[in-house]
């Protein structure tokens, strides 16, 4: 009995039903609930697993490099980045007939291949890689790092190398090491790589291990650094006629503030990027020396937080008690980390397309669309996870005595006001936005488009103008050519910025109108409603008017019977579950908006977006239906084409998505009866009755069925849109 899964829970291991398997999987990572767990073992297990995570990441990235070097066309892509399609890897599929082989043999390959829409070619090219040998070297190095990480993980599980709890809770040392060591030193090292390898490569000079000690990154070497004439490093930048990867039109500057984009590659100037990383390195190296460790100087986090008591008295005891609450709660720390990471991931999505850092990536439209969508979805899952762990913190780790009258306690005390205000904002946004869309729909349907309600986003246009966009005619700040801000800026900073903002061939400050105004508010509705559900779930996790003792039931309970006026669907888990649907819905609107706006921009028919995006039928007909034609046409009487795989994935995604509803809209009794019937039939059928269950089959619990349904819904939803996005974009701009 002792060796049955799950080893971490004797109670579950002895369960005679299939519940043993499902609950075992569900609680495998909930270390806190495992048998014989101590605080020390909890911290040590998590710490060791981080090394495993790093090993997987290094192995994965190593695999990317290896497969491109082995099966890709990196060297021929480097010769002509705009016209050669980058190959991710070869496809070996015994089912392929001749038409399929022909359809997927692309990019100069000898057999069927996958095209890379991840941007890795552009990235590797920008940072100075040029040959397959470079890629193999990188793959081997990352494989080595992966092995080192695995060894480190194993090592930190050995008794002699297990860190103590006090080491894990030493906040100041961890801050110093992460700020200086992780961010500071790595940013400085990256600046070094850009200056010593990437910038010379962009000027046609190859710097490798055999010559990097002989090649000066700047004609004057370290002279200007030691004499304080740092401005010399910014003089003689690459000219606007510079051909990337060659010496033609190249300069000698290494750290600049040019602003705008390299005219040929449409990406940020590499010398600007190096300068940025140097500044980041400086800030973080300083920040990593601010906290008090063994030397008795610097800040103590506890003293800092305890001193944060606003004098007006309107925030009570301010941050008193927060240090211990955060430092003793892994869920609090994880929640904060996920919230920050989620926001950063969304910012990455926004900045990768508007300020592209990699050479030629802005002209690879499918990659731009794929990267934006990918990062927004990742951000959504990470952000909802932040609230999930926030709710678990409130249930498991929050101590009311420790936090009396501080900001955390006051949040919980006036939660009704927070929830009702969020609710009001969501209702207001929803009804007004839908009202405008539907009104416009009706006007179009009745043939009177001039009666639409079209609102210009004047405040957003004013902000764009203040930053230098002249087309709206606001004549304010940087868009006012006679103003002091404009004149001062010409000589000091970012001369290329104003050109970039006012050029229509990039995605920086796109021209916006009534369609943007409407979809902006639709997205605002989605964001506020998602937030409402998540915030309510966390704030009510310990108890609500209906169920004051909710915290005793844990994070994910389905119901507490029929009493109390109905206690089903009110656990913190239920809030998370509902919020994920809203999150997916919202990101759907975000990505639809981004994609349609950009397709019309790239095709040169922005008027289609401007005219059709002001009413719902326009979105359904001119975006979704019009752009799914390639997918619906993936297989036709003329045989297959290179979009067929996406057509199949589009169908398959819908299937997975629809399967989710089977778990989401059903009664447990039905499933139990179905399972009993299947088991009965199996046991009475020759051959099938040779296989016997050791566990009695039981239906999934309510919470489990919802999780399975949600997983199918999410995966199907994202698969379907990914296929739509890639096929419709690559079909137009192949």
UniProtKB/Swiss-Prot annotation:
It is a multi-pass membrane protein. Keywords: 4Fe-4S, Chlorophyll, Chloroplast, Chromophore, Electron transport, Iron, Iron-sulfur, Magnesium, Membrane, Metal-binding, Oxidoreductase, Photosynthesis, Photosystem I, Plastid, Thylakoid, Transmembrane, Transmembrane helix, Transport. GO terms for biological process: photosynthesis. Chlorophyll a B1 binds at residue 654. It is an enzyme of class 1 (oxidoreductase). It holds the Pfam family PsaA_PsaB. Chlorophyll a B3 binds at residues 662, 670. The PsaA/B heterodimer binds the P700 chlorophyll special pair and subsequent electron acceptors. PSI consists of a core antenna complex that captures photons, and an electron transfer chain that converts photonic excitation into a charge separation. The eukaryotic PSI reaction center is composed of at least 11 subunits. HAMAP family: PSI_PsaB. This is Photosystem I P700 chlorophyll a apoprotein A2. It comes from Atropa belladonna (Belladonna).
């Amino acid at each position: 009995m002792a060796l049955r899964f799950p080893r971490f829970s004797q109670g579950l291991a002895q369960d005679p039903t299939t519940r043993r398997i499902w609950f075992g999987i569900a609680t495998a990572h909930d270390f806190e609930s495992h048998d014989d767990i101590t605080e020390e073992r909890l911290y040590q297990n998590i710490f060791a697993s981080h090394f495993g995570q790093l090993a997987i990441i290094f192995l994965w990235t190593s695999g990317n490099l290896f497969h491109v070097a082995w099966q890709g066309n990196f060297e021929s892509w480097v010769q002509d980045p705009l016209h050669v399609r980058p190959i991710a890897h070869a496809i070996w599929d015994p089912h392929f007939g001749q038409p399929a082989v022909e359809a997927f043999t692309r990019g100069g390959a000898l057999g069927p291949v996958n095209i890379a829409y991840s941007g890795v070619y552009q990235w590797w090219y920008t940072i100075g890689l040029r040959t397959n040998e470079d890629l193999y070297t990188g793959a081997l190095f990352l494989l080595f790092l992966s092995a080192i990480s695995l060894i480190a993980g194993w090592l930190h599980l050995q008794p002699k190398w297990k860190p103590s709890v006090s080491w894990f809770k030493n906040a100041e040392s961890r801050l110093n090491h992460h700020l200086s060591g992780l961010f500071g030193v790595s940013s400085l090292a990256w600046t070094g790589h850009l200056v010593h390898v990437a910038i010379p490569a962009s000027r046609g000079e190859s710097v490798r291990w055999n010559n990097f000690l002989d090649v000066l990154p700047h004609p004057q070497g370290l002279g200007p650094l030691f004499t304080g004439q740092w401005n010399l490093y910014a003089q003689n930048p690459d000219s606007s006629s510079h051909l990337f990867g060659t010496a033609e039109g190249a300069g000698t500057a290494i750290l600049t503030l040019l602003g705008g984009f390299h005219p040929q590659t449409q990406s940020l100037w590499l010398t600007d990027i190096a300068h940025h990383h140097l500044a980041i390195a400086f800030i973080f190296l300083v920040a990593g020396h601010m906290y008090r460790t063994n030397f008795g100087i610097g800040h103590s986090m506890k003293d800092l937080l305890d001193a944060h008591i606003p004098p007006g008295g309107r925030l009570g005891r301010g941050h008193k008690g927060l240090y211990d609450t955060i430092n003793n709660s892994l869920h609090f720390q994880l929640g904060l980390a996920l919230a920050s990471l989620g926001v950063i991931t969304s910012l990455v999505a926004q900045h990768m397309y508007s300020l592209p850092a990699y050479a030629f990536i802005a002209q690879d439209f499918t990659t731009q669309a794929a990267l934006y969508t990918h990062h927004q979805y990742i951000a959504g899952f990470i952000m909802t996870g932040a609230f999930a762990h926030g709710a678990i913190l409130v249930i498991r780790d929050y101590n009311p005595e420790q936090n009396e009258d501080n900001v955390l306690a006051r949040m919980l005390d006036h939660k009704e006001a927070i929830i009702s205000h969020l609710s009001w904002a969501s209702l207001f946004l929803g009804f007004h936005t839908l009202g405008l869309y539907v009104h416009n729909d009706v006007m179009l349907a009745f043939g009177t488009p001039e009666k639409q309600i079209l609102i210009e986003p004047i405040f957003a246009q004013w902000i764009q103008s203040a930053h230098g966009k002249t087309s709206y005619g606001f004549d304010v700040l940087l868009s006012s050519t006679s103003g002091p801000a404009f004149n001062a800026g010409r000589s000091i900073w970012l001369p290329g910025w104003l050109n970039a903002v006012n050029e229509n061939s990039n995605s920086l400050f796109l021209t916006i109108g009534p369609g943007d105004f409407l979809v902006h508010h639709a997205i605002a509705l989605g964001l506020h409603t998602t937030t409402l559900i998540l915030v309510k779930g966390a704030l009510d996790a310990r108890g609500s008017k209906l169920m004051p003792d909710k915290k005793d039931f844990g994070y994910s309970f389905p119901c507490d019977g029929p009493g109390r006026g109905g206690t089903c669907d009110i656990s913190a888990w239920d809030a998370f579950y509902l919020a994920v649907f809203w999150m997916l819905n919202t990101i759907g609107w975000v990505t639809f908006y981004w994609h349609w706006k950009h397709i019309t921009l790239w095709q040169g028919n922005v008027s289609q977006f401007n005219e059709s995006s002001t009413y719902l039928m326009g979105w359904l007909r001119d975006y979704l239906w019009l752009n799914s034609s390639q997918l619906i046409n993936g297989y036709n009487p003329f045989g297959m084409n290179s979009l067929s795989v996406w057509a199949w994935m589009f169908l398959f995604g819908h299937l997975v998505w629809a399967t989710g509803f089977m778990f989401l809209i059903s009664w447990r009794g039905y499933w139990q009866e179905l399972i009993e019937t299947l088991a009965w039939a199996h046991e009475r059928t020759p051959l099938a009755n040779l296989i016997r269950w050791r566990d009695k089959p039981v239906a999934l619990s309510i919470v489990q069925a919802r999780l399975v349904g949600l997983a199918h819904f999410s995966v199907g939803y994202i698969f379907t849109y990914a296929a739509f996005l890639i096929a419709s974009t690559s079909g137009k701009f192949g």
